[in-house]
Design a protein with these regions (language model features):
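Active-site groove signature of glycoside hydrolases
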Residues: 85-106
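Acidic (Asp/Glu)-rich catalytic clusters
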Residues: 25-29, 44-57, 79-90, 142-145, ...
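Beta/alpha (TIM)-barrel catalytic core signal, keyed to glycine-rich beta->alpha loops juxtaposed to Asp/Glu
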Residues: 66-72, 101-179
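Structural preference for beta-strand elements that scaffold enzyme active sites
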Residues: 1, 33-36, 57-61, 91-94, ...
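Glycine-rich anion/phosphate-binding loops
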Residues: 16-19, 42, 68-81
Length: 179
C-alpha cells in the first residue's frame, strides 16, 4: 500500500495465494497477461495457479532488490537473486527503484553498474528494464544507451512518492525512448 503499516499488514494477511490467483485469472481472461511485483514465491505460485486455471501464460515483471555494495548477505548478491527471478518464471526483470535510484550518477550521466546487471539479466534469458521513482533514471538511461527495454516510472497526479513535479515527470515519460 505504501500508505501505512496497518494497511500493509492487512493486505499481506488477506491476500493469500488463492485470492491473488483468482484476481490474476480474471485479468488473464480479459486479455491482461502481465503482472508486476517483487520477487516473492507467492507471486510466482499465484501466477502459475492462474495460468493453469485459464490456460494462458502470465508474464511476470519482477522488481528485485539485491546487494549493490560489498558485504551484504551472500543470498542477496545479484547472481543468486537473478537466478531466483528466472526460477520464478520472470519474463522481465527490472531492478527495483530502491537500488536503481541510488545508482544514478547525475554528474557523470550514468547509472553505475547497470550494464553489468543488464548483462546478467539477459544471460538468464530475461528482458532488462528499470523500475524507478526518479525520472532522471529514464533520461540518463536513454542518453547513455543503457540496455533497457522498458521502464516502470512512478507517476500519479497527486505526486505521491514522486520526487519532482508531476508535469515534469509526465514530459519525461512521454519523451522516453522505450515504453
Amino acid at each position: 500500500s505504501h500508505t501505512s503499516a496497518a494497511k500493509d499488514k492487512f493486505i499481506k494477511a488477506y491476500m493469500d495465494r488463492a485470492r491473488i490467483a483468482e484476481i490474476m485469472a480474471v485479468f488473464l481472461e480479459a486479455g491482461v497477461d502481465a503482472v508486476m511485483g517483487p520477487l516473492t514465491p507467492l507471486m510466482g505460485e499465484a501466477a502459475r495457479d492462474a495460468e493453469d486455471r485459464v490456460g494462458r501464460k502470465m508474464h511476470l515483471i519482477v522488481t528485485p532488490h539485491f546487494n549493490i555494495l560489498p558485504g551484504g548477505p551472500p543470498e542477496m548478491e545479484p547472481g543468486p537473486v537473478l537466478d531466483r527471478c528466472k526460477e520464478m518464471g520472470a519474463t522481465f526483470c527490472f531492478p527495483h527503484s530502491s537500488m536503481v535510484d541510488a545508482l544514478v550518477d547525475r554528474l557523470n550521466r550514468t547509472i553505475r553498474q547497470y550494464d553489468t546487471y543488464a548483462k546478467m539479466i539477459r544471460e538468464r534469458g530475461m528482458i532488462p528494464g528499470l523500475s524507478t521513482h526518479l525520472p532522471d533514471s529514464v533520461v540518463i538511461a536513454d542518453e547513455s544507451g543503457a540496455d533497457v527495454e522498458s521502464y516502470i516510472q512512478l507517476f500519479n497526479a497527486a505526486g505521491f512518492l514522486m520526487p519532482i513535479e508531476v508535469d515534469w515527470a509526465m514530459r519525461i515519460i512521454q519523451k522516453a525512448a522505450k515504453p
